[in-house]
Amino acid sequence: MMRTWMVYVVGLVGELYGSQVEETREMREMKEALERLFSRRLSDSEIEMVESLEDGGNFETRVLVPVIFHKDKVVVSPAARYRDIEKEERVYVEEVIRRLRSLVWHSMVYIYVPKNNDWIMDLICEVLEMSSPQRLDDVALYKDTGGKCGMKFVDLVNKMFKQNADMLIKFGDLLSNGAETRILELPDSLREDERRREVEMLQRVKEYGKMLCTEDKQKEIVEAQKIMCDACEQIWRREEDRKEFTMEIYSRYLNMKVMRGGVERDVEDPLIDHMDHYMLISTHKKYKCMDVVAELVRKVFVEDKDIEDSDVMSAVCSVRERKRLEEMREMEERKRKEEERAKNEEELLRMVEREEREKREESKGRGKKKRGNRGAGESKEESKGRGKRKRGNKGAGESKEEDRGEEGGVEAEDPLEEMAVGEAWRKKKGSGEKRISEEHHYKVHSRVLRWKKDAGEIKRELDEGYEKKWKNRSIEEIKEQKKVHDIVEVMKLLRDKEKCDRFFVRTGKYMKGKSERWKMVANGILEEGGEKKVGKVEVGLFKGEGGESVVYHLMFRPTETERTGRVGGSSFGKYDDVDEIKKEKSSDMFGFRYPSGVRCEMTSNRNEFRIEYRNRKNTSEVLRTLTILRIPET
């Protein structure tokens, strides 16, 4: 899990600092850049990972994510055609498309090789300049409808991969020969161990170049990208999957922006992600089911991890369970329709029987003996009178039915005055009455509320508590943890259903510790002392004994702890590191106030919810700021 993140970050560092530096200085600057990004010193395991990249390089396979972002929204989805793009975004998209072929080429051939990156990068650019197919106008290609509806974005990406594949033989041959030349040119002054490492590294480059010349490798690169495009298109069809996927893309763009010191780029290229081609292709061949592949891609992408056999099986199980639930819902819907149809048929039968009975009674009345002329006249007049009276009564009856219908309409609106919807309620919007937004109701577990207290009291509670992972922590550690856990003001955002749905994604439910649990996740930025950390705001919930939703976990998880797996794994994963939740006191937070002198200001708009934590002795001093960002528009 950690490796993909570190490779990704090393790529960013290379972008910032370039590769034309000595190894020792390169290593030092890389570590310093990472520590600035993380706002802390690197751990031993992280330093070891950076050093392993320097020692072994990176030859991992990659795929391109077929999505174009502009600021905080998706402007081109996998299946988008040019005509689908908003007019005000088309100039931006066209600029991205012009750069896309170069990005595709780099994703196909780029490798990270310490002390050799200069000539390899020059070679990548040189081959692209020499061999790019006839300087194709990719924008015109994407815009061209050819009398039809035009090509999808994934079709454009796949076409570029196929066209660029023709350049792999030339690049592979030059790369292999270049590595061989450098082996022969190694200076005699090198120590034996240094020479051995250099030869081993260049030998790997040489073998990689030869492999690119093979038809099998060329097919693998193109096929893996085709599967990735199909998977992303499938992900886009399910709203919950699409939200998670775009949130993770947005999170990575935010990280790159922080890495650049907050500098906005004129154009953000689509992301390149490390993904095992062999596992991707073999899963597709084995299951022949794009639902399984899409679930696998979604899982490893949002959890930022390498594909493992367990991930494949998890994807298979998730798809099977989803289909089982869909079949159950379809069966219930069919059953409901059948019952409704039977009920309608029964009602229709009763109506027919009633009409036939009325006809028989009417027929009997006409069969009575006729009276004399006078009697007939009187009968006729009486009949007319009765007819008038009858029609008059009928009109009255109709009027009553209409009145009842109007009354029914009023009654249908009455429940809106205060309607319970699961765990939500709303009030009817009346004339001159301010609309009250629908609310969620939660209880907050004491393990969340403890972080409101001072560090010393928190430490005493944790040392005496039942959660082993929190025992014997230093005061310094507790203070650091308080910064990311003492964010109970987020509950204000959670309670407002409309806002909550705009900022938070709900993950699937899972069972742990005899309780049904689930999460809500949002992108966020924590700022303190001029340093910014990108991460996820996590809310962990379970069902209480009374059926209420109880918040047992609330924190801001910085990206580096999520990706290194140091605290509970991915925010989107269907698991957590809380083994047991004791039946302790929970609060609905009604009337909650911090101690006197502490001030916390909250502001919000459609795009962000901002919490400023201030110094209790000097409220003009902002200690830290948590900004929660809305789910990107798709």
Curated annotation (Swiss-Prot):
Top-level taxon in the UniProt lineage: Eukaryota
Compositionally biased spans, kind Basic and acidic residues: 354-365, 397-407
InterPro entries: DUF3654, UPF0329
Family: Belongs to the UPF0329 family.
Region (Disordered): 354-438
Protein name per UniProt: UPF0329 protein ECU07_1850/ECU10_0050
Pfam families hit by this protein: DUF1609, DUF3654
Organism encoding this protein: Encephalitozoon cuniculi (strain GB-M1)
Biased composition (Acidic residues): 408-417
